[in-house]
Amino acid sequence: MVTIRLARGGAKKRPFYQVVVTDSRNARDGRFIERVGFFNPIATGQAEALRLDLDRIEHWLGLGATVSDRVSSLIKDAKKAA
């Protein structure tokens, strides 16, 4: 099953997440199909905290992809800000 979820990156104690489309059987930070955005939970000042390609996300949702709980709330926030 294809899912849209977060893949963790960044350094220890400084998380940075890629929003990726992947097969649900793959490891969290493993192989993915497409990168559709990023989320920086510790962004401060002028740093961009969230960027999502909503067109590609809608495309994958139309093909039947599921969305993790956290990514679902991020999509909601991005749509509200747009």
Curated annotation (Swiss-Prot):
Does this UniProt record's set of keywords contain Ribosomal protein? yes
Entry's InterPro entries?
Ribosomal_bS16, Ribosomal_bS16_CS, Ribosomal_bS16_dom_sf
For whether the record's keyword set contains Isomerase, the answer is no
One Gene Ontology molecular-function label = structural constituent of ribosome
What domain of life does the native source organism fall in?
A: Bacteria
Q: Which GO terms describe its biological process?
A: translation
Keywords annotated in UniProt: Ribonucleoprotein, Ribosomal protein
Quote the NCBIfam families the UniProt record gives.
S16
Query: Per the similarity annotation, which family is this?
Result: Belongs to the bacterial ribosomal protein bS16 family.
List the protein's name.
Small ribosomal subunit protein bS16
Record gene name: rpsP
